[in-house]
């Protein structure tokens, strides 16, 4: 989806401009691990999750402002910073910081309304 591409580009350029280190899983060093995006197909609500280690400290307020200024078809309803210091290469959270909004979005399917969070399993196939 075009919104996801815009968000990915924004986040990539933000960290590239600031020369922020990416996580090297073999050495277990670096800051930026993953970007997780979730979007409700019918609602257009979007959750943005930036997953990092705690090895560095960065103020993500300006990233939040850049994301919220993007011209999107849908709407960002939540921006989260998840801290993950696990050795495994999996998206999980040792600590979650809500930078903006809420930690869930809604999706509707067959007249039902579902509340979907970061780690919800939702597979409407």
What are these model-predicted stretches?
Residues 1-124:
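Accessory RNA-recognition modules of RNA-modification enzymes
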């Amino acid at each position: 989806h075009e919104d996801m591409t815009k968000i990915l580009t924004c986040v990539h350029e933000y960290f590239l401009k600031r020369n922020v280190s990416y996580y090297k899983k073999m050495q277990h060093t670096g800051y930026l691990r993953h970007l997780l995006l979730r979007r409700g197909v019918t609602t257009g609500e979007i959750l943005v999750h930036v997953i990092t280690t705690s090895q560095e400290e960065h103020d993500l307020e300006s990233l939040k402002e850049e994301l919220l200024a993007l011209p999107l078809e849908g709407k960002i309803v939540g921006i989260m910073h998840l801290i993950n210091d696990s050795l495994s290469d999996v998206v999980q959270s040792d600590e979650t910081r809500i930078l903006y909004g809420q930690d869930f979005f809604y999706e509707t399917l067959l007249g039902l309304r579902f509340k979907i969070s970061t780690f919800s399993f939702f597979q409407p196939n």
